[in-house]
Amino acid sequence: MIEVRSVTKRFGKGSRSVEVLHDIDFSVGTGQIAAVIGQSGAGKTTLSRIISLLERPSEGRILLDGTDVSGLSERRLRDQRRAIGTIFQASSLLARRTAAENVALPLEFAGVGRSERRARVAELLGRVGLSDKADLYPRQLSGGQRQRVGIARSLALAPKVLVSDEATSGLDPNTTRSILALLRELRDDLGLTIVLITHEMDVVRQVADVVTVLDAGRVVESGPVIELLRDPHSELGVGLLPDRSHITAEDRDVLWHVTYGSDTVPTNWIELLGKATGRSIGVLSGTVESVGGRPAGRVTISVAGEHPSVGDLLSSWGLHGTRVDDDASARTTEEAAA
């Protein structure tokens, strides 16, 4: 659906030019929710404007459904923009327009007739759960309600793609969860492809299918969220499910960092490990969650004394284990079994 190919973006000319994106590559499939994550200054907003066709890349291409849109004329670019809806951080509603009038704005610009506009606005406000707020002004709405109006407005022209630029930033956790649930529902009901620009790990973990990490304008990690969560060497995976506490254990205990690596990990694997090794197993810390209906987790365990089969046993149950040695070096289950 969306392909970003070797995109570079510079602002300014000659010796004064500043490169804010460098050779960016990633793709988003139809119906996927993709997150682009990074700290302030990473280039996220510039990338979102390029995907939204509000900026042209200095180099590289943007493809929508296989069509290269980065080199289109301004007229054709305006037509293509109708296929992309954008949700902004502060909802960007017009203060002197009611919720319904804000949602109607893109339809007015597109020349849609009054009766058709009214029907479409009513439909959209109902879809985002604000049918009873149609005549209220932005100042009369909560932050979450204003963002829902912004989402309804972004859907006015029936786009195929939604680009959300920090749409949940500044919202409280409960409101954030409700907005993300709404976006997931819209994806499922309308077949939308959604790109989430965010700096929040929780947003990625809750709704994203794939994620791309930007740092100083470069891609440093990219892939399906569940695969990164299950990769014991993924920095993003550790950030999404952190479990690296400074833990003290008994002198004879051997510590293992364990990462879930498959859909078939037994729920009682700790009990099974204790029985198979004849050792006492302690859980020192951990996080286990369902991500997109699939298990993901990172757990630190202690094993009472040495046992040569711990690594192999963990692997047989779909787990990646990293033994933490006394000198703070570590070896994976594959190394331990070699």
From Swiss-Prot:
GO molecular function, one term: ATP binding
Entry keyword Translocase: yes
Gene3D superfamilies: P-loop containing nucleotide triphosphate hydrolases
Protein topology in the membrane: Peripheral membrane protein
Zinc listed as a keyword: no
ABC transporter domain mapped to chain residues: 2-241
Enzyme's top EC category: translocase
SMART domains associated with the record: AAA
SUPFAM superfamilies referenced in this protein's UniProt entry, alphabetically: P-loop containing nucleoside triphosphate hydrolases
One Pfam family this sequence matches: ABC_tran
Localisation per UniProt entry: Cell membrane
UniProt binding sites for ATP: G38, Q39, S40, G41, A42, G43, K44, T45
PANTHER family for this protein: AMINO ACID IMPORT ATP-BINDING PROTEIN, METHIONINE IMPORT ATP-BINDING PROTEIN METN
UniProt subunit comment: The complex is composed of two ATP-binding proteins (MetN), two transmembrane proteins (MetI) and a solute-binding protein (MetQ).
Function: Part of the ABC transporter complex MetNIQ involved in methionine import. Responsible for energy coupling to the transport system.
Record's protein name: Methionine import ATP-binding protein MetN 1
